[in-house]
Amino acid sequence: MSSLKKILGLKGKGKKSKKLGIAPPPYEEDTSMEYAPSAPIDKSYFGVDEMDTHDPNQLRYEKFFFTVKMTVRSNRPFRTYSDVAAAVSHWDHMYIGMAGKRPFYKILAFLGSSNLKATPAVLADQGQPEYHAHCEGRAYLPHRMGKTPPMLNVPEHFRRPFNIGLYKGTIELTMTIYDDESLEAAPMIWDHFNSSKFSDFREKALMFGLIVEKKASGAWVLDSVSHFK
């Protein structure tokens, strides 16, 4: 977790990252990525004696580098951004990947969808509509999801079909996100969105399984991730 001083670009003396460079689990590991215990975790279990307790009211800041490359192929042109979001939000159906990065990947998929541009028809594969987006940079995310695991510089690729109403096609996503431990200031991740595509930000975020709330300052905060999307 990046401290607020690092987010704002303020130097601190003797401040070291608490994150460990632990290798991520194998990408091919086929296991359930959803875990929601119904009772307090027994502290006698291995590895939980020093586990960070998740306080849903505690605001944290995560600073990172990111890259997202997206290609969407559809059987017909999308009419509105709502059509785009309905299709792209299925990218993590039957998700197999790094569990700790999934909430951040949801944000990057949402971000990429807002920056999609249509490929000229003459260049489209077999004459079918294609859309592309490529976004990268540095950003920070205010959130209430508890302590996040170390995020290493490991790209992941996803390819999923979609069949939503009149639209059928495929989504291809390559995403990379890793910790930024520098002292340089960074913009909020929401600043990288093309907000001209939509006005109902909270509703569109929920389509990607992101539950966001607005602070008194007007900034959006990721409160949690929906288990139903």
From Swiss-Prot:
Q: Does the keyword Phosphoprotein apply?
A: yes
- Identify one Gene Ontology CC term for this UniProt entry: host cell cytoplasm
**Sequence motif PPXY motif, location on chain:** 24-27
Q: Kindly provide the PTM information from the record.
A: Phosphorylated by host.
Q: Where is the composition biased (Low complexity)?
A: 1-10
Compartment annotation: Virion; Host endomembrane system; Host nucleus membrane; Host nucleus
Q: Where is this motif: dynamin binding?
A: 2-4
InterPro entries listed in its UniProt record: Vesiculo_matrix (IPR009397), VSV_matrix_sf (IPR036711)
Q: Which domain of life is it from?
A: Viruses
- One Pfam family, please name it: Vesiculo_matrix
Q: Name one GO molecular function term.
A: structural constituent of virion
Q: How does it sit in the membrane?
A: Peripheral membrane protein
Specify where the region named Disordered lies, as residue ranges.
Answer: 1-23
Please indicate the residue ranges that the annotation assigns to the motif PTAP/PSAP motif: 37-40
GO annotations under biological process?
A: symbiont-mediated suppression of host mRNA export from nucleus; symbiont-mediated suppression of host transcription initiation from RNA polymerase II promoter; viral budding via host ESCRT complex
Q: How is it used?
A: VSV is used as an oncolytic agent for cancer therapy, because of his wide host range, rapid replication and mild pathogenicity in humans. VSV used are mutated at M51R in their matrix protein. These mutated viruses cannot successfully infect normal cells, being unable to counteract the antiviral state induced by interferon-alpha in normal cells. Cancer cells are impeded with responsiveness to interferon, and then can be successfully infected and lysed by the virus.
Keyword vocabulary terms for this entry = Apoptosis, Eukaryotic host gene expression shutoff by virus, Host cytoplasm, Host gene expression shutoff by virus, Host membrane, Host mRNA suppression by virus, Host nucleus, Host-virus interaction, Inhibition of host mRNA nuclear export by virus, Membrane, Phosphoprotein, Viral budding, Viral budding via the host ESCRT complexes, Viral matrix protein, Viral release from host cell, Virion
**Assigned protein family:** Belongs to the vesiculoviruses matrix protein family.
What does this chain do? Forms a double layer around the helical nucleocapsid, the inner matrix layer binding to the N helix and the outer matrix layer binding to the envelope glycoprotein. Plays a major role in assembly and budding of virion, by recruiting cellular partners of the ESCRT complexes that play a key role in releasing the budding particle from the host membrane. Condensates the ribonucleocapsid core during virus assembly.
- UniProt domain comment: Late-budding domains (L domains) are short sequence motifs essential for viral particle budding. They recruit proteins of the host ESCRT machinery (Endosomal Sorting Complex Required for Transport) or ESCRT-associated proteins. M contains two overlapping L domains: a PPXY motif which interacts with the WW domain 3 of NEDD4 and a PTAP/PSAP motif, which interacts with the UEV domain of TSG101.
Which protein, by its recorded name, is this?
Matrix protein
